[in-house]
């Protein structure tokens, strides 16, 4: 990781922080936590003995350590949004991991500033799964039921008068049948302590908008809220700095505040650097707050200057330029790390998606970690932020519907205030496939939520992921949304466009093609709900669920109709839980197959299909399947090529198999080059791609693999920060003596880590594998897996060694660099 990344990492920990003066201090509670599953009557009390509890660091997901088991959260339900009418046993729906139950966390913290006079102290939880009850020094400080939202509570009056040795205890409870996917468990996001003067800018206390934006000028409006400021004459001095730290605008204003009104300042930035995926420029507003010439607070807000418009019959415009979303939906887990947030893991995921050409993320179906939103700001990924998978009608027996009536507005307000200054966020979604959409008065609930968005942030439009097209077209639900968003149902898009007043259609959730990396099934044909005895799906990318479709259909819609706004594919990454099409009593199967990238962060073949359409800057030439089929000699073994070149020629052992060109013969022929009648014989398979002028542009070769010979290790993370958190992802492969990957190899690999780091986890992308991620061993899947090492806080070198019986071992070194 470069030094600039280290600086950005530090900024991510506290995007709104004090710069000097010691007036505001924010720190994380990461180390020295004690944890135990189970309920303890006296655990909130300071005198409670937790010495025998497990010592953990936060963020922490208690369930990811397993074990996998069919019985964990076994559900018998009918998934109505998938068209099911009869309840069936669902195994692995929430990942087969032990997230259900009660857990307690305990720690202590000091606030020595209390000795110097009156202060205010706030605890902020970025996410706690779930039904969090927070206790400080034996007294309940707050309760927040929704595990995905950020919440905060004022604990000033609960602290010891000297500010020292304050006991914090958090009780969490996950009920069975409370989720449709793996939610994680515990304090899986960061916990902050914020210390300020009595009069201060509160959490999320600024609101930045850009009412006018052009290439030559941008107006910036900053509303600053202040607590305990009524009746006081306030002076605020604000500098706006560009990404180089240069002051580009300055204002000093004074006014008397009453009735909780915000302090308003207006600025002009000349020749602004506009935020976009191609150029994610960011600014900082640094505000100093004075009362009677005394500096009482200093607050920093990061924002971007950009203009968004959604125009009927035209589409989405960013900074005046029409574009269609090339987005993906992602659940919140980080594969083998579980739900515990990690910035370097998030960055690795996002960079893989960006190389594919992805430019947008939908946070399905919950509020995201703040680190994800900050990274999208920096890297240039647009976002649709979505809070709910259900409203007041249940999808899950113990889901959010239990809290909706009382808590929905509070959850929405927290979410919007948290992320309304982030330029990456271009729209809000108020829900996903909610059963309420088909109720006659369902539009009233949608209107209630949409109006909260409009009230708290009138600068962004609102959508909702709708899947019951007939209902929402007839009952007014779809017509009252700012942007009608549809999940699948591609054959109904044109009908929706013709009937709805918005004259726009957004693919809020698309495709749901299923595949297992490196697994190929014969014969090759388009199939819905295809299942096999090995619980895998074919990587020919021709299989989907009964309610979904193949990627080519969505590509064609986006290209052929000006009123389509693009798509958010289900999903960018495989995730824990929801193992369709094997979710009905088909154990073992603990993770999804929808991902373009597998659970080990290894791209599937489908990755290159999207890349060939979405990545306009670089060439793509990818061939499948592998070419090691000892049992298929003489049998038809189709070959697919995913490329952004218009035509290519295939050779098997030097003999041409013909030239294929993209055509309108079928929707698949528009986007794939396919040789359906290749007769397998071992040897060399080569594809030569030609450019539009007919010149040879690029070639790719796959060879039949010999016997497995050795392990190989490779990483893109040659250097990482020595911060005790950063990760290096290491790809592990088995190759023959000539270096060809052995695509069927599934040996057990053992890992050993020495030096300035530790073993963190491994994954192989096999949804049926029950190896535990945290143990230093993992079976290969389709000849590959990913191992992850973590830095310590001491600079040096991390040595990872991989061994497997009968194979030559391999070593790799990662440098851990001081901050």
Language-model-detected regions and their locations in the chain:
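Extended carbohydrate-recognition surfaces in non-catalytic/accessory domains of CAZymes
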Residues: 21-124, 178, 184-187, 199, ...
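Accessory beta-strand-rich segments of carbohydrate-active enzymes
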Residues: 25-27, 38-39, 95-207, 229-230, ...
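Extended substrate-binding grooves/exosites of carbohydrate-active enzymes
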Residues: 37, 61-67, 154, 190, ...
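Short flexible loop/turn segments that cap and initiate beta-strands
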Residues: 46-48, 233-237, 278-284, 644, ...
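Short glycine/proline/serine/threonine-rich loop/turn segments at secondary-structure transition edges
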Residues: 116-119, 160-165, 179, 269-282, ...
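Extended acidic/polar, glycine-enriched regions
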Residues: 160, 223-311, 675, 681-682, ...
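Beta-strand-rich structural segments
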Residues: 222-226, 288, 625, 639-642, ...
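Short S/T/G/P-enriched beta-strand
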Residues: 310, 612, 618-638, 647, ...
